[in-house]
Amino acid sequence: MSSRTLVGLRSTTSTHLQRSGVAAAAAVSSSSTSSSGSAPRRCLSSASGRQVQQSAEFSSSSKSWDRLGRRAKEKLLDREFFLSLLNSASTKREAKSYLARLKAQHQGTPPLKPAAKQPGVAEAAAPVSSGASSTSFYGASRSVYDSPVFRHDSTPTPPLQDVSERLHLALVKITTPQLLDDSTVNGVAKTLSQLNRLGMACCVVVDPGTAGDSNQLRRIAAEQADRISTAVDAQPDSKSAHIDSVLSVSALNPEAPKVLSRKLLLGPLRDGHIVVLAPIAYTEDVPRAVTVSASDAILALTKELAGLATNPDPDEDPIRTAQRIAGLQEEVSLDRVILLDPLGGIPAFSGPQTSHVFINMEQEFDDIENELLRVWQSAASAKNNLPEEGLPSIADSNPLSKFADTEVVPVPPSQKAYSSDLTLGTSMVEGHINNLRLSQAALAMLPSASSSIITSPLEVANSAQSPGGASPDVSAVGTRRQRNPLIHNLLTDKPLLSSSLPLSRRAALNGRRDSIATQPSHTTFVKRGMPLTIIPNPWLSPWTAKDRPRLGLDDPSIDLPRLVHLIEDSFNRKLDVQDYLNRVNGRLAGLIIAGEYEGGAILTWELPPGVEDDGSEASQARMVPYLDKFAVLKRSQGAGGVADIVFNAMVRSCFPNGVCWRSRKDNPVNKWYFERSQGTWKLSDMNWTMFWTTPGLTEDSQKFRDYEAVCRSIQPSWADDTGVVD
């Protein structure tokens, strides 16, 4: 992975960073874990005049560091960067998925500049971004584009066009940074620098909180913006830009700031700077600085960057208006909205989990919001401090999710307060509600591929440090570092922990269940997501063998052609549709569909061979809840949380008392099944492994034999009878 380094050329710096980024991702794809001796040299940008600096985990007084030469320091810093990437994407599948997303950015790349060609030699047809960030590797480097390629036939030269590379951006809100120590701020700055190097430009908004008057908050915000900017500048090959005068407010609507200058904001981002903003806006009539809500600033920036802030002229042709908005959206892709809050991710107070590691907004927003509101109401009621007019301003702060007083679900008498420190507890719940609503409001303006991450600055900073905080030696072997939630999410588009993992298989959690103050919250990954359809509705009628529906897959409420396509695409086999319908119709327990048939599960009630289905209680007691088909479209596998959404619906809503299924012994998905099942059993003389989520199954010998008999007896319904055991 060696490359030539030309110091002082900005384009060469971009070339090196692009190559090093792709090399890092490729290293993950090949499962390489060695980085010493193969890391490329780091380039210095003459524009900043900055010397190579040591990263946050190196001690400035370290004698071993001082003895290293410049090139050795460069290699050591690059090794640290690559190790962070290798640790964040732990599987080849995750790395390949990331590389595929990068490749998709350049399908249909346009034209290049005209150039004279020698006979038999043609130029590589690809554009060079004139305004690309010097740290982006979403596009190939200039030297790659300008390299001649051997070609027998001549290649027509496309016309010259000025094509700018699309800017990929993360919008970051850091809450109360004045309460963070320097080590945490430096760790956050290091992660932002790594994101920038990976091609994800960062725009940071400082949130000073609400403790203090307007003048105090404005002073704190400006000081903390300078502090974060200084921490970013201290990172190797990293530059910041603390920008004022980006936001403005009108006298008619002082609570709705808007972006004053799009160019002022995007210019430094395209130049590779990490932009830092304070939530300060200027009035339009008489220029005067006023403090605005950091959440309102985030929404204003989101609206502008999503291309939705334009005010079309009523006389303008609608087609031209649409083209202008589309052009703005092509300039920038706001991929992430990151909320760094000391509170951490969104906690959970129902079910076995203690925090939400993944939220599908389309499906879960209302339920989670109601749950948090009940917790707030319970804590406030216990302190006899519930306002007579209903909930406080948090219930009305988000115009996209109004929650009237009458909609608040009454607190059951048996429900106790969730925190011993009720003043602290209510304020913390308000913070979680605001984070949830801010994520929902921002994602509502963005494409479905965008996402939000809610985590704590401490978790990001800790994962940015080397294990033990010691200065790493070139040949040192140490403890595996904690995965960085932001880097991991960029590479995998997934949360650190799968939401469908049983609690027993997650990292050990400390703290009491009924205390917000002591309850640790994992990082929460939020997607606008997809709707979830369950037929029949388990909340109206629980799925039981006695009340099983008279439902078939050819029911009008089911789109059978799309369901068949989902199964065939997922299994990569043709289904004998009529044979399959004959087998499952009459046994169907229900159907789970995620989104527009992007994923799904078909569940049935099965009887062991020899047991007659006569409708008796004895027959119903022997029925086995069975997962007949679990399918996810290939394009949705490995990312987006589709499988987790379907699996969670199955085990939490449809069959909370347990379900079983079977899989080929050599199925690569079995590892995923192993992690989510209560137990497994390899069927002798067959190529099947049985899985179940039923608690205590092995203690009930009759039920266990029924499960095994069902998994042995079901015949596949594939049209391509290749003789291969399914």
From Swiss-Prot:
**Annotated region Disordered: where?**
1-64
List the pathway annotation: Amino-acid biosynthesis; L-arginine biosynthesis; N(2)-acetyl-L-ornithine from L-glutamate: step 1/4
Gene Ontology BP, a term: ornithine biosynthetic process
Reactions that this protein is recorded to catalyse: L-glutamate + acetyl-CoA = N-acetyl-L-glutamate + CoA + H(+)
The alphabetical list of record keywords is: Acyltransferase, Amino-acid biosynthesis, Mitochondrion, Transferase, Transit peptide
Q: Which InterPro entries does the entry mention?
A: GlcNAc_Synth_fun, Vertebrate-like_GNAT_dom
Q: Which GO terms describe its cellular component?
A: mitochondrial matrix
Subcellular localization is given as: Mitochondrion
Task: Please state the Enzyme Commission number of this protein.
Answer: 2.3.1.1
Please, which domain of life does this record's source organism belong to? Answer: Eukaryota
Gene3D superfamilies this protein is in?
3.40.630.30
The transit peptide of this chain lies at 1-44
Limits of the N-acetyltransferase domain: 547-716
Q: Indicate whether Nucleotide-binding appears among the record's keywords.
A: no
Cite the record's Polar residues compositional bias ranges: 1-18, 45-58
Instruction: Kindly list the GO molecular function terms attached to this UniProt entry.
Output: L-glutamate N-acetyltransferase activity
Which regions are flagged for Low complexity bias? 20-39
* Family the entry assigns: Belongs to the acetyltransferase family.
Instruction: Explain the purpose of this protein.
Output: N-acetylglutamate synthase involved in arginine biosynthesis.
What name goes with this protein?
A: Amino-acid acetyltransferase, mitochondrial
Please name the source species: Aspergillus niger (strain ATCC MYA-4892 / CBS 513.88 / FGSC A1513)
